[in-house]
Amino acid sequence: MAEHDYHEDYGFNSFNDSSQEEHQDFLQFSKVFLPCMYLVVFVCGLVGNSLVLVISIFYHKLQSLTDVFLVNLPLADLVFVCTLPFWAYAGIHEWVFGQVMCKSLLGIYTINFYTSMLILTCITVDRFIVVVKATKAYNQQAKRMTWGKVTSLLIWVISLLVSLPQIIYGNVFNLDKLICGYHDEAISTVVLATQMTLGFFLPLLTMIVCYSVIIKTLLHAGGFQKHRSLKIIFLVMAVFLLTQMPFNLMKLIRSTHWEYYAMTSFHYTIMVTEAIAYLRACLNPVLYAFVSLKFRKNFWKLVKDIGCLPYLGVSHQWKSSEDNSKTFSASHNVEATSMFQL
């Protein structure tokens, strides 16, 4: 895909026949592995993020600042996964969609990468404020909602500006086959440094600091809500690290050790870790919606409204879920300070 061009000549032509054969085997493997991975992420991400959008807009109706951020998160991931079929086709065959489409998809990919990561950071900061400064957050809900909408807009604008180099320098190149990418080493270095800072290290540092304080605060709270919140926090951190750290470490190694470009095993590692990183588009709906009782309640409402399951078969389960949700949401202040709504 746009992150790494596996068909570029990194010195393989100067190696022996054995190295050439290994590289050809790798290219054949990438033609199968990457398109399959892209299509799996596309299908799962399309269904999951569409559900989150529909339920958030038409059922939950943006009642909190977290909801404002959560609408932008699946929207960014939804646009991202819609580009994957194009990359899957290009991985199997070659780029046949033209230069304008190439620039557009490179821009969409990059914009949504930054947008998703910055939104995750904003959600983390919001949870920090709600948990650590609960009373102040509750008394300033109107201001926080306005701040959230302005911040969401700024995130999209910043992401667009940061993505301009890839949009401008993105092009179609004719190597062994037509590929879409950007082919300027200076631009690639700048883009990589910016991406590593905004897309990984800054969110990671923010999440570590904020969640450390959140955990310390919740450990003094006690009760069921404390344990539930800690589980969600650890899940968020674990999935973020497991999906993003391997690929970002490989990109860092790639930018500082050019000798690895001639190693087929390095290309395998880059490809696999890249695919794992894209799984975030599927996992985000699970992390930020499916663990919520409110979401499950609204999901059963959606199922009932569209009639995709027999009414008698789900009515009792939906009613039970609704009653449980009412029980847990009896105290607005408890819910607002618990991370539980995530």
From Swiss-Prot:
Cellular compartments per GO CC: external side of plasma membrane
CDD domains assigned to the protein according to its UniProt record, in alphabetical order: 7tmA_CXCR6 (cd15173)
Membrane topology qualifier: Multi-pass membrane protein
GO process annotations (BP): calcium-mediated signaling; cell chemotaxis; immune response; inflammatory response; positive regulation of cytosolic calcium ion concentration
Glycosylation sites: N16
Entry-linked SUPFAM superfamilies: Family A G protein-coupled receptor-like (SSF81321)
Segments crossing the lipid bilayer: 33-59, 69-89, 104-125, 144-164, 188-215, 232-259, 276-293
Role this protein plays: Receptor for the C-X-C chemokine CXCL16. Used as a coreceptor by SIVs and by strains of HIV-2 and m-tropic HIV-1.
Family under the similarity heading: Belongs to the G-protein coupled receptor 1 family.
Protein name: C-X-C chemokine receptor type 6
